[in-house]
Amino acid sequence: LLALCLSAPAMAQYEYGEGLDVPYVPSPNEVVETMLKLAEVKSSDVVIDLGCGDGRIVVMAAQKFGARGIGYDLNPERIKEANENAAQAKVQDKVKFIEKNLFEADIKEGSVITLYLLPGVNEKLKPRLLAELKPGTRVVSHSFEMGDDWKPTKTVEVNGRRVHLWVIPRRAAGN
């Protein structure tokens, strides 16, 4: 609740699409770095950021960890800004940004999925994450959890902000 109150001034900047209302509130760089470290990102990873905004998570994953990355966002201005940030960081060969609804994003290639979405959006996305991602894929969320039935593997705090990590479990035999 406190996190929602703190982000209230930014609530005016909404991204819209098929019932998806997510405010554009960028994660601070220290939170981004914590997210990537918590997920133990390495050069062999593909980091997919759903609701990438200005691309800072994907850009940092490429720049600091050597990972490849894909960012999805509905807003063409955010995609343009993300591409500019990738070019400025000289990582445009490792990242790409796609203008698309996050529920239509191709997430199967991801070994790390990053989120800074509202709780209801996380919960709506959860069945897809569990169904489409390979066991061992790391999912990291800034601030918001995935509901009561999927507890984080680990939660850390950075400057009063929570970062949650989940690992996609092995599927039961026959699934």
Regions found by a protein language model. Name each.
Residues G55-V59:
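Glycine-rich SAM-binding Motif I of class I
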Residues L1-P9:
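Bacterial N-terminal signal peptides
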Residues S44-G53:
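Conserved class I S-adenosyl-L-methionine
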Residues K108-K124:
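A short SAM/SAH-binding and catalytic strip from SAM-dependent methyltransferases
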Residues R68-D73:
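Conserved SAM-binding motif I beta-strand of class I
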Residues G120-N175:
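C-terminal substrate-binding/active-site "lid" region of AdoMet-derived donor-dependent transferases
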Residues M11-D45, P76-E109:
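S-adenosyl-L-methionine
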